[in-house]
């Protein structure tokens, strides 16, 4: 499966869209907002460019990316005022895979510009926003054109499903699982780690050419607390997806062979792995590396399991539909998913 041609968050603004089911991602970015804004302030103090180049890598199609830009503009406005500098122009590049619903982002731009002009006597800052489709696992931008790179909830997605998961006959060595689980052989976690190393190293190398000397990056991604790949965090939610798909197999909606060959292109690194890989690649230095845990929450009248199921559906629907075809009932699949999450949570209470 060609991830770059298939993978995308569910577009539009419907009930199952990413725009309606990305509150978890918004909460994560809000939790580290102070770090992002401090980084922007430090950057402007040290460089104070007349034209500030900003890239949001993995912007997706929800409202989160434009809210980030608004926050950045406000911090730069305040900082430039303190320094008695004229406000720079802002060059904003919104990047995601070509399959992303960029139109939803573009349709929200008039409201974004209108909000920025409110309470500003001079009509607002000069902001030039462009969509930049393509994989960030490789070069995207000209040399030395960016000052700040931001990526939230994207770098845990690999460029592809690790090829080493399959034997010489093309059969998965991780049958019945969509990710690393307790029943996975050691070669599975090694395959995922090797793919993450390859991808993350290429990401860092590519960005090092595109960002100016003294530029900054803030990267937010899912990770794991310890060295064990199987925990009650990310691997747990993929385990629930494996079990939900197994129910679809038992109901005759999909073939067992299809389930056995489905693997997610995902990896949750530990902080040690990130730090080691940044040091090994050598282009950047880690200034700050922290782990945050997000509290469970759900919308009013909705169970936690349902909230998680809707989030997973919004990020996995494109891949599931492409792999399993039209025969799979997504509503039933994710209803089962939500129920199982609630059952597991009840056992912990």
From Swiss-Prot:
InterPro entries in the cross-refs: MeTrfase_7 (IPR005299), MeTrfase_capping (IPR042086), SAM-dependent_MTases_sf (IPR029063)
Listed EC numbers: 2.1.1.-
Cofactor(s) named in the record: Mg(2+)
Gene Ontology molecular function: metal ion binding; S-adenosylmethionine-dependent methyltransferase activity
Pfam families: Methyltransf_7
UniProt-annotated binding residues for Mg(2+): 174, 260, 262
Entry's Gene Ontology BP terms: methylation
Cofactor note: Binds 1 Mg(2+) ion per subunit.
Site (Involved in substrate discrimination): 150, 222
Entry binding sites for S-adenosyl-L-homocysteine: 18, 59, 64, 96-97, 135-136
Assigned keywords, A-Z: Magnesium, Metal-binding, Methyltransferase, Transferase
Family affiliation: Belongs to the methyltransferase superfamily. Type-7 methyltransferase family.
Full protein name: Probable methyltransferase TCM_000336
Organism for this UniProt entry: Theobroma cacao
